Amino acid sequence: MPNVNPAPIGVFDSGLGGLSVLREIRALLPHESLLYLADSKYAPYGEKPEAFVQARTLQACEWLLAQGCKALVIACNTATGHAVELLRQTLPVPIIGVEPGLKPAAAASQSKVVGVLATANTLKSGKFARLLASLDGESRFICEAGLGLVPLIEQGDIDGPDIRGRLDNYLTPMLEAGADTLVLGCTHYPFLSDTIRDMVGNQLTLVDTGSAIARQLARKLVEHDLAVAPGAVPQDRFVSTKDAAHLRQMAAALLHIETQAETVAIEPAPAF
């Protein structure tokens, strides 16, 4: 039986990129309550040591469980790559991670050349290496670490000259190699979709796994008898480890929603 008094679903990211995943969850599961945690004090994770990312992600998820979350979505490719296996071994709730959509991109590509834009840590992770190896021979993957993109997006710059200049540097080698498909391998990057389309037109088909993550979450909720009853009124909560006002502003700018947000302390952070 669906629970008529549902606990929230925790959605975690190092910063604001996970809002792109939250958007898809809210669209698919309108009655579920969501607790969004942005670890903006320590963002971005993409260039942090692996040991820090792993320990900090576990610390953040333990905080979410203490708030009563019934399931967790790790809406951060870097955190998923370094920590999701540890989380599943350690924590007693369903955990849904994210990973770059290499498989659907390879299937969609006509040229069999696929561009992958992701953080440096995602590209270095063992999880990504295994995913790439599993698709050996299906397509050629041109991988670029999107250095500098996340801080600009966190500041609200999704269409300015700085971000366009960086995108041009990353996309040009892909196009020159014959790529016709682009994997958005960081949850921040869907907020750049309109800018990328403006820059490259229909030369690249964009692959974003946000909707697939939402569907996987829905399946897990049913599988574990955690789904909310239809008609329940969701109670969402948005928290940040650094700047609640900025989180509120960016939720309004990126998702077009008005919400309250609060600042929380999850300390001490791991020392690495």
UniProtKB/Swiss-Prot annotation:
It catalyses: L-glutamate = D-glutamate. Gene3D superfamilies: 3.40.50.1860. Keywords: Cell shape, Cell wall biogenesis/degradation, Isomerase, Peptidoglycan synthesis. One of its GO terms (molecular function) is glutamate racemase activity. Substrate binds at D13, S14, Y45, G46, N77, T78, T187, H188. Its EC number is 5.1.1.3. The active site is at C76 (proton donor/acceptor), C186 (proton donor/acceptor). It is an enzyme of class 5 (isomerase). InterPro entries: Asp/Glu/hydantoin_racemase (IPR015942), Asp/Glu_race (IPR001920), Asp/Glu_racemase_AS_2 (IPR033134), Glu_race (IPR004391). SUPFAM superfamilies: Aspartate/glutamate racemase. GO terms for biological process: cell wall organization; peptidoglycan biosynthetic process; regulation of cell shape. Pathway: Cell wall biogenesis; peptidoglycan biosynthesis. It comes from the Bacteria. Belongs to the aspartate/glutamate racemases family. Provides the (R)-glutamate required for cell wall biosynthesis. This is Glutamate racemase.
